[in-house]
Amino acid sequence: MEVTALRRSAALVARASSQNAIRPAVCAAISSTSPTPPTQIQTQQTRQFSALNRPPPNYPGHVPLTRLERFGLFVGSGLISLADPLRGDLIASFAEATATPYFIYRLRDAMLSHPTGRRILRQRPRITSQSLNIPYLRSLPPNTVGRTYIDWLDREGVSPDTRSAVRYIDDEECAYVMQRYRECHDFYHALTGLPIVREGEVALKAFEFANTLLPMTGFSVFAAFTMKKSEQKRFRKIYFPWAVKNGLRAKEVINVFWEEELERDVNDLRRELGVEPPPDLREIRKREREEKRRRKEMERMLSGRGTEDVIQKAEKEAEVVAERVKEMRNEVVEKVGEVVGSSAMRG
């Protein structure tokens, strides 16, 4: 009897021990299927929301954008720059918003496929007033690239230091390609002779689009519809055909190492690149203003006030002529008197 009781007690103890060992595992299994604590839910939500935020910058000054932010930058800067093509800051933002994902890579590949372009990408030079040595450019002969460039800067009242830094292109090398294009823009102006007036900027943007295929340059051409009718007509007949022809025919201007061409004859460089300067836009605009001024004067003269002015002017001229005739008559009378007197003395 005692042995049997001991065996039963041992069995009960073993059963209790096994149940105690199973209970933590069951509790752990139950706890794994229980609702997530509030703090853990908040952490997951924060992690999901952070995916919508900007990633870390890839280079100094870089501002990464989400797709929504890039779209907003595209719409806002595009509409305002279309109305005012001289807003360089908005045009720069619009260029960066539309250059990716394809077009800036195509321009980068064009540089990589050219020996000079590859050197530019390796050295990454910047075009500023310090790097170009402005006083030296002014000492160059008039027909050189450097002198043509600095004369254009002085005539238009601009500086190479006004180009803003690229911020919205994610790839660092492509960001430099955009920066290089931006800083070379004034060299394109000097090479073609186009001024920074709206008409000249739109014409140069059309040239750049045909040569670089950057979307911003193509969209900028639509700013021609905001110009005056006379300017639109001139752009349609002269400068747009010139831009398309020369932009497609010319070599990739992004591959020009301008810093090494400063002492070269500008016409030789134009021939090498295949760029033919357009008609002088400033001279055309000057002649147009003079023609308008003469036309207004003619209209004023043909009006009532103008007729009165003409009559008064004619009367004054008639008085002057009459006075002169009177003086001439007196002179003739005096001469005749002298002749008669001398004849009488001889007689």
From Swiss-Prot:
User: Is Aminoacyl-tRNA synthetase one of the keywords UniProt gives this record?
Assistant: no
Annotated GO biological processes are: ubiquinone biosynthetic process
Transit peptide stretch: 1-49
Q: So what does this one do?
A: Lyase that catalyzes the C1-decarboxylation of 4-hydroxy-3-methoxy-5-(all-trans-polyprenyl)benzoic acid into 2-methoxy-6-(all-trans-polyprenyl)phenol during ubiquinone biosynthesis.
Name the chain's protein. Ubiquinone biosynthesis protein coq-4, mitochondrial
Q: Where in the cell is it found?
A: Mitochondrion inner membrane
What metabolic or biological pathway is this protein involved in? Cofactor biosynthesis; ubiquinone biosynthesis
User: Could you say which residues form the signal peptide?
Assistant: none
What is the main EC category here? lyase
Give the EC number(s) listed in the UniProt record. Answer: 4.1.1.130
Keyword Chaperone assigned? no
Q: Which reaction does it catalyse?
A: a 4-hydroxy-3-methoxy-5-(all-trans-polyprenyl)benzoate + H(+) = a 2-methoxy-6-(all-trans-polyprenyl)phenol + CO2
Q: What is its main location?
A: mitochondrion
